[in-house]
């Protein structure tokens, strides 16, 4: 029940719908923004979070709530799912600051049957975020799809960094999958 309570609390951060493209099977879509701060420990006081919490992180983050919700939804490879957004999670963080569970976030999504389009297609971690210092070294943004959609993937890349960053459109690059 506490996970459902957190999903409700973060209803503006986890948006979902079923898209029904004409002449095609429906697509379950989840847009997510995981804040750069953990879930308030006071709300979790007295709750056993061990089945949800990352192994190498003392806190619970919205990425874990997302994972638990998806796990309970039991997406099938034959279903069309898109889960995308700013997860504020990059494996580079584990390298910079020691193990904090960022790789586990990605592994959990893979274990649920999701394919990370950008990383899968580019074969390397592709930075999507420009820090206030100007450094572009972390992939905070992710686009996951189930097998039925990944089988149709022709390409996945980021938007043009000079256009996005150069025109101050965002500090995040869009991820494009075709």
PLM regions and their residue ranges:
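Active-site regions of metal-assisted phosphoester/phosphodiester hydrolases
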Residues: 1-178
């Amino acid at each position: 029940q506490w996970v459902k309570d957190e999903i409700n609390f973060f209803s503006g951060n986890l948006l979902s719908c079923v898209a029904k493209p004409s002449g095609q099977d429906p697509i379950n879509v989840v847009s997510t923004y995981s804040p750069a701060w953990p879930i308030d420990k006071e709300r979790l006081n007295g709750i056993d979070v061990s089945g949800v919490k990352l192994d190498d992180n003392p806190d619970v983050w919205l990425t874990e709530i997302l994972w638990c919700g998806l796990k309970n939804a039991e997406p099938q490879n034959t279903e069309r799912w898109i889960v995308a957004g700013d997860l504020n999670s990059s494996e580079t963080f584990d390298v910079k600051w020691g193990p904090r569970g960022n790789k586990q976030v990605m592994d959990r999504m893979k274990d649920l049957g999701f394919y990370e389009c950008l990383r899968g297609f580019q074969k390397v971690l592709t930075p999507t975020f420009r820090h206030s210092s100007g450094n572009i070294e972390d992939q905070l943004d992710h686009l996951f799809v189930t097998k039925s959609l990944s089988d149709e993937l022709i390409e996945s890349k980021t938007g043009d960094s000079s256009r996005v960053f150069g025109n101050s459109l965002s500090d995040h690059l869009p991820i494009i999958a075709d």
